[in-house]
């Protein structure tokens, strides 16, 4: 209802007015336990060091994840739900689920691209092989709690940097999901939307301001939040992320403009995560569902 309200009320005299605001997004980050890397004799493969050297490609990351796996216990957990691994891999492959034409509310489903299919397959292979924990059905906090306890060396897609950095008893490392060529991903799916309330007395003035602000990303002062709890390396990483966001490199995946976990879409994704349907079949099944949902916002 809120999303529908936003797109309807964001219209004035035939023109659509929307704005977005971002925070210091950490969902593209990978947190890792340097102590466990050392225990596995993998401290020579420090992820952030490799990233700064331009050597951490997605395939290199996957190789390290596999090398950290002993055939019994997974090396990696994914924050909140395992599907977030598929999402991050889609960004690493250079695509997304839903895109938007800048300055408008015209959305397109891009989940049917070859890039997303290949990304989902790579992510699902890691789940199926046991390299990554399939925590479907667990509490949304399970992965971050297990990582914080020191039970797994790698946490992908963490939105809990502040809590983990404040409370972990191990040497914490961080990097960003790399794309296939080794460039750090800078893409999010959680943005703030706003619309003009119907009873505003000066809607034209509000619309003018919002129209000027549309498609801008506002950075926040993250330094006071993190500078006393993270290492200099992690702080440098946050600085780099902030600079890229402000420079206009931040991309947005708009799949949250619809509820992908309803109307059958989520059920298909859950079948894929459980391994009962292939990524290609899942994507084929949900592509038209997503397109149909997006039509309600035209």
Regions inferred by a protein language model and the residue ranges of each:
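Short, solvent-exposed loop/beta-turn-alpha elements that line the ligand-binding surface or hinge
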Residues: 1, 51-53, 96-118, 179-187
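A structural signal for short loop-to-beta-strand junctions that line the ligand-binding cleft
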Residues: 1-37, 183-187, 195, 248-255
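Extracytoplasmic/periplasmic solute-binding protein
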Residues: 7-30, 38, 54-108
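Short helix-initiation/N-cap motifs at beta->coil->alpha
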Residues: 53-60, 134-148
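Glycine-centered hinge/linker elements that transmit conformational signals in sensory
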Residues: 61-67, 100-137
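Paired acidic/hydrophobic, glycine-rich loop segments that form the ligand-binding mouth/hinge
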Residues: 153-158
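Conserved C-terminal helix/tail region of periplasmic/extracytoplasmic solute-binding proteins
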Residues: 198, 203-204, 217-298
């Amino acid at each position: 209802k809120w999303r529908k309200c936003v797109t309807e009320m964001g219209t004035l005299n035939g023109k659509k007015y929307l704005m977005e605001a971002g925070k210091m997004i950490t969902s593209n980050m990978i947190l890792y336990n340097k102590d466990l890397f050392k225990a596995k004799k993998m401290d020579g493969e420090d992820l952030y060091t490799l990233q700064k050297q331009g050597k951490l490609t997605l395939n290199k990351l996957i190789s390290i994840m596999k090398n950290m796996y002993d055939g019994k216990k997974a090396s990696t957990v994914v924050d909140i739900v395992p599907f977030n691994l598929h999402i991050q891999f889609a960004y690493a492959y250079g695509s997304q689920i839903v895109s938007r034409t800048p300055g408008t509310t015209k959305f397109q489903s891009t989940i049917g691209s070859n890039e997303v299919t290949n990304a989902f397959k790579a992510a699902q292979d890691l789940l199926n092989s046991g390299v990554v924990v399939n925590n479907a059905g667990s509490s949304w906090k399970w992965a971050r709690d297990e990582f914080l306890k020191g039970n797994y060396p790698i946490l992908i897609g963490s939105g809990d940097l502040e809590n983990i950095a404040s409370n972990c008893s191990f040497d914490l490392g961080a990097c960003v999901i790399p794309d296939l060529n080794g460039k750090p991903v800078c893409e999010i799916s959680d943005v703030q939307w706003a619309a003009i309330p119907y009873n505003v007395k000066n809607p034209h003035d509000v619309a003018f301001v919002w129209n000027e602000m549309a498609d801008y990303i506002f950075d926040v002062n993250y330094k006071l939040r993190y500078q006393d709890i993270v290492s200099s390396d992690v702080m440098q990483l946050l600085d780099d992320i902030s600079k890229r966001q402000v420079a206009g490199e931040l991309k947005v995946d708009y799949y949250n403009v619809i509820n992908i976990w309803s109307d059958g879409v989520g059920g298909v994704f859950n079948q894929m995560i459980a391994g009962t349907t292939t990524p290609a079949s899942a994507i084929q099944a949900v592509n038209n569902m997503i397109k149909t949902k997006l039509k309600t916002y035209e």
